[in-house]
Amino acid sequence: MGALTGIRVLDFTRVLAGPLCTMLLGDMGADVIKIEDDVRGDDTRQWGPPWLEKNGQQFSAYYLCVNRNKRSVALNLKSRAGQDTARTLAAHSDILVENFKPGGMRAFGLSYEELRQINPRLVYASITGFGQTGAYSDRPGYDFVIQAMSGLMSITGEVDGAPHKVGVAISDVIAGLFAHSAILAALFHAHRTGEGQHLDIALYDTQIAALVNVASNALVSGETPPRYGNAHASIVPYQPFRAADGEFALAVGNDGQFRQLCALIGHPDWSADPRFATNPARVANRAALVDLLDGVFCARPARAWVDEVLRAGI
């Protein structure tokens, strides 16, 4: 039995952010009913290859990654019959999640204002690119565009290179996780008070929130954050290093670990050097320290360094 056993979720979402959110609710034991277009289904059913072959059928790997623990129902929401069925399901659900553009559910007679009349306890979550209100609210919200507009691409990529998107649709993932936690809080509120609520989750807002220390640094300094490639803006050493047979990743999070590292590589004096003794000093003298470490690490295989660093607890 999961924490959400007995909770019913009505899932009107497609693609990634919404389906991830509802899948996690299903993982916790909720009964998730996924409403799909009666002709084409979720868009991602057609996204491939790769395909999983089973019982003579092909299933999109993309679709499968965020749609476990769900029961699918095909409805034509443009028809009276489809809308009536959706309303009946909503009347007996605890949670509804949708990711149409603002106003999309209202066109089907399924807005929060309409459904709360038949189910006052309903937790109704809307996931969009830019929220229910505001100058950009009518824009579609694709992950790639959100990564660009939020500034995430500006800080991703090589130091002297072009901005890059992250290798997965991270803005979608972040929005789905924010929606999941907001729904749990709203569900708790509904169980205490009997009151449902409408949750407004925007990919843009949640991606801005996920910039965390980079956004804080920019607000405090007033400067546009540069790209650091695989290095860290505020911690040194914290990047890949080239060993004799390839690269390995090294993350030294504090001065104590740096002293351990220096002892391990046979240069305990470096940890007493004023240029490197503290993390702010190491950040200020990043290039000099990285050059010294490169000269040490290139002498042995990557696996040997990784084993030694792990044994030292770094």
Residue ranges and their predicted role:
Residues G222-Y238:
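Active-site Gly/Thr loop motif
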Residues G176-G196, A209-S221, C262-D269:
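Oxidoreductase and adenylate-handling cofactor-binding alpha/beta cores
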Residues V39, F130-G131, L203-I208, D245, ...:
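Glycine-rich beta-alpha junction loops
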Residues G196-Y204, E308:
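Beta-strand segments within the central parallel beta-sheet cores of soluble alpha/beta enzyme folds
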Residues V236-G313:
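Aromatic-enriched alpha-helical interface/lid elements that frame and gate functional surfaces
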Residues M1-A182, A186-R192, H198, R227:
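N-terminal helix-loop segment corresponding to the beta1-alpha1 unit
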Residues N76, E98, I201-Y204, L250-V252:
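Active-site-adjacent beta-strand anchor residues
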Residues V32-I35, L310-I314:
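Short, well-structured beta-strand/strand-turn elements
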